Amino acid sequence: MARNDVVEWLLEPDQPSVRYRTLTELLHRPGSDPEVRAARAAVLRTGWAAEFLAERTPGGWWGDRSSFYTPKYLSTHWRMLVLADLGVGRETPTVARSCEVWMRGFPLKGGGVGGNSKGTGHHCVVGNMARALIRFGYEDDSRVRRSLEWLVETADPKGGWSCWGLGRNLDSWEGLGAFAAYPRARWTASMQDRVEKGAEFFLERELHRQGARYAPWYRFHYPVHYYYDLLVGLDLLTALGYGDDPRLRFALDLLRRKRRRDGRWNLDAQHPDAEGAIGRWIRAHPNRAVPLQLEAVGRPSKILTLRGLLVLDRIGE
């Protein structure tokens, strides 16, 4: 399957979210293009985004209103992170309602979003919510801006962030993710500094060299939520303009090796930590996290194929 055939596969109408993003992000069609406008409209009628929106309560949330965070990964917080990848925005009233409900459910001290019940921020939540809300069209919202400022304030001075309280690590990618989504022209000098140092943290480790080899980082998965793999790293670093850095070579070679002969990429896993001690813990607990499944494991993935092609497109392949 030649590249054009793969692109045609992504443009099939069964998943208009993928079609819309392929037209706009890979083929660089403007929003005024008739095919782009038709695909954007179709996103609300059929496919993953339409199914998500149809499952909401009238109030704009999923599941139990008492917790937008649990159960993982089926409740409001996790659904919104995925919905942000599916080509919908705040101009749709139902989406805007869910965004407002979501933001009110995670207030951050000082006026941002991503806080817990006490308003205390957690890097993974703040970064993820900021990134998703920017994709929904809230880049001018003061709450999103405050969240970005919080990410600047809480970054490690040497570069990177800590999501687990164990020091900066590759799993803590969400801060870079937020700034990768935020228009470059709006970055402040402090944002630029944090991005440059954060990117260097990943690059000096070649996106994977930290501690013992960790198998989940080499499995491409979706939904990403707050987990890391090398495709997540490549997507971030190339989107931030580091595609020509030679320290991406290992990760790019892995991306090329994982590509099927027909030009597509398989979904390696729904949830990356399904083995070892963490996997045993998940299976031993009756209230364990339930992965949110969009595509079949071991089969060609439209979402991963689009992301893989976007990475290669940014480096001129």
Mark where each language-model region is:
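Preference for long, amphipathic alpha-helical scaffolds in soluble/luminal domains
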Residues: 1-317
